[in-house]
Each structure stands twice: as C-alpha cells, then as structure tokens.
C-alpha cells in the first residue's frame, strides 16, 4: 500500500481498503492457508516532517493445529498498528507494504492450536484423538506412546 504524502489533508486522511495476501510471500506454506484479503483502516497525518500512520489491519487464515494437524479458521488482527516514517523534502510517496507484511507475520502464533481441549494425534498410530480413541494398547504407565523408552535411561 502506497500513501501519497502530497495528498494528505492538513487534518489527516483516512484510508480503508484491502491488500492482496500475495504481499506476505507465503504461497505454498503447508501450515497456513489464506482465506481472504488483508483488510486495513488507517489514518495518516504529517507531523513535523514525519508521516504518522495509525489504524488496524487484519486477515482471515486457516492454520494447521500443532497438536492434531487439522486446519482451523481464525482472524489475525492488529488493532493498534502504528508507524512513523521520515518524510524528507521532495518525497511524495511512502510504501507501507513491508510493514503490513511484517505485522501480519508477527501476529501468527508459532504453535497454533485449534482448541485448548485438543487431544492431538496418537503417537503410535497417528489417529486424531479428537475423533475418538484409537486401538493402540497403553504402555506400562497407562499412556500410548514410545516415550517410555526414555524413562529407562534413568
């Protein structure tokens, strides 16, 4: 998104719109699917040779759950977007694209979970335990899994 500094009114200007999710550079990411455009609402003002941009950005995405690997939809939002850009003499435009991209990517959870109650996958057979129990036999401590081998190292 490019703001033309020369067209900003003395009282500031409002910008509403959508940006292509292509600016994120995440095409083909196996853990995330884009479900809509990046939406924004900004207010831009020139204050003491600086362009100050405040507002909100957001987008809908489907993320892979870190426990069960199923996809779930969520909205990523920053309700307090704030940036200041120096505007030297002769500069007519300021590009916000990289800052919008950075903000959206930093808002994504590194270990997204579909629900706090998600049971995940069986470590032996890989069945999604949210869909029901698997037929694996529990190990000595009552849980299915191969981690019991590590307990023997003590």
Describe each model-derived feature in a short phrase.
Residues 68:
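Conformational-control "hinges and anchors"
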Residues 1-62:
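A positional/architectural concept
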Residues 1-12, 73, 82-154:
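Charge-rich, low-complexity linker and terminal segments
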Residues 37, 71-73:
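Short, mixed charged/polar active-site loops
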Residues 18, 43-45, 75, 114, ...:
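Generic signature of intrinsically disordered, low-complexity segments enriched in small/polar residues
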Residues 54, 73-79:
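A short coil-to-beta-strand element that immediately follows conserved catalytic motifs
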């Amino acid at each position: 998104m490019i703001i033309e500094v020369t067209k900003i009114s003395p009282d500031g200007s409002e910008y509403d719109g959508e940006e292509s999710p292509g600016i994120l550079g995440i095409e083909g990411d196996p853990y995330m699917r884009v479900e809509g455009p990046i939406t924004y609402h900004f207010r831009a003002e020139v204050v003491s040779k600086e362009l100050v941009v405040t507002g909100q950005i957001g987008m809908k995405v489907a993320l892979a759950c870190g426990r069960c690997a199923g996809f779930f939809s969520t909205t990523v939002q920053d309700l307090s977007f704030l940036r200041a850009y120096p505007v030297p003499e002769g500069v007519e435009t300021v590009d916000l694209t990289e800052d919008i991209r950075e903000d959206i990517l930093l808002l994504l959870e590194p270990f997204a979970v579909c629900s706090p109650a998600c049971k995940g996958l069986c470590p032996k057979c890989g069945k999604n335990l949210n869909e029901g129990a698997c037929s694996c036999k529990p190990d000595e401590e009552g849980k299915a899994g191969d981690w019991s081998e590590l307990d023997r190292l003590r």
